[in-house]
């Protein structure tokens, strides 16, 4: 009686490497992942900080049923004083986010900063949402909720106090934060308009921290020259 044949799936692997088909499929798959990673990690994406604040699903009722689409509220900034907000809508979530990123880049604006914080207190409004921002001394951190924090992080503000009132809708809060940041003025311009010295406009702890930063930079420069 002949011995039963061993199944292909349960037989012991051969001593050689993987078959040509397996090597081809694995090679294509690994190569595709590497190429995809290079595209996602391009220079254009690395220079910006992106934060997806909220994603909503929208349903449209038509004769044949309901058609679903997605909206994405995205904040984009360089982490160094430039920030923008975009709103994208598409049938797929990644496409909606990509559209929001592109719109946010079109809405970039500069934010005045002093030693990682804002130069003065400010209030912003959008619809029923109200956001208050106040300067904070170095080391305080960003005291803010999710939507406000997303905008401040992308703008490169590291020390600030915030309070949001009224509407809790993320879209209103984000636009109120943007309105507050757009209402900021450079300390030198405020001092010149009021006829006051700069020390009377900027809080003392921030000025002292700024002076220490300049002294440290000068010390490092002198050490490097020597």
Curated annotation (Swiss-Prot):
One GO cellular component, as annotated: small ribosomal subunit
Superkingdom of origin organism: Bacteria
UniProt entry tagged with the keyword Hydrolase: no
Keywords: Ribonucleoprotein, Ribosomal protein, RNA-binding, rRNA-binding
Positions of the S5 DRBM domain: 48-111
Pfam families hit by this protein: Ribosomal_S5, Ribosomal_S5_C
Coiled coil (UniProt feature): none
Biased composition (Basic and acidic residues): 20-45
Gene Ontology biological-process entries: translation
Polar residues bias spans: 1-18
GO molecular function, one term: structural constituent of ribosome
Record InterPro entries: Ribosomal_Su5_D2-typ_SF (IPR020568), Ribosomal_uS5 (IPR000851), Ribosomal_uS5_bac-type (IPR005712), Ribosomal_uS5_C (IPR005324), Ribosomal_uS5_N (IPR013810), Ribosomal_uS5_N_CS (IPR018192), Ribsml_uS5_D2-typ_fold_subgr (IPR014721)
Region entry Disordered, spans: 1-45
Self-association and partners: Part of the 30S ribosomal subunit. Contacts proteins S4 and S8.
Functional note: With S4 and S12 plays an important role in translational accuracy.
Note on domains (UniProt): The N-terminal domain interacts with the head of the 30S subunit; the C-terminal domain interacts with the body and contacts protein S4. The interaction surface between S4 and S5 is involved in control of translational fidelity.
Family annotation (NCBIfam families): rpsE_bact (TIGR01021)
Family listed: Belongs to the universal ribosomal protein uS5 family.
Protein name: Small ribosomal subunit protein uS5
Origin organism lineage: Bacteria, Bacillati, Actinomycetota, Actinomycetes, Micrococcales
């Amino acid at each position: 009686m002949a011995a039963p044949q061993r199944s292909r799936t349960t037989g012991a692997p051969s001593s050689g490497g993987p078959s040509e088909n397996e090597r081809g499929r694995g090679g294509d798959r690994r190569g595709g992942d590497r190429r995809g990673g290079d595209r996602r990690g391009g220079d254009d994406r690395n220079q910006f900080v992106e934060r997806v604040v909220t994603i909503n699903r929208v349903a449209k009722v038509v004769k044949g049923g309901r058609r679903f689409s997605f909206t994405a509220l995205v904040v984009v900034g360089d982490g160094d004083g430039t920030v923008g907000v975009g709103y994208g809508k598409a049938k797929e979530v990644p496409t909606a986010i990509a559209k929001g990123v592109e719109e946010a880049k079109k809405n970039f604006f500069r934010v005045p900063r002093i030693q990682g914080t804002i130069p003065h207190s400010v209030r912003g409004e959008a619809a029923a949402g109200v956001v208050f921002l106040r300067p904070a001394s170095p080391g305080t951190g960003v005291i803010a909720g999710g939507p406000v924090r997303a905008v401040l992080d992308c703008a490169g503000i590291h020390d600030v106090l915030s309070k949001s009132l009224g509407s809790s809708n993320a879209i209103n809060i984000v636009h109120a934060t943007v309105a507050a940041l757009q209402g900021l003025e450079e300390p030198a311009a405020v001092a010149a308009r009021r006829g006051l010295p700069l020390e009377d406009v900027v809080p003392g702890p921030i000025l002292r921290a700024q002076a220490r930063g300049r002294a440290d930079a000068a010390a490092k420069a002198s050490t490097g020259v020597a």
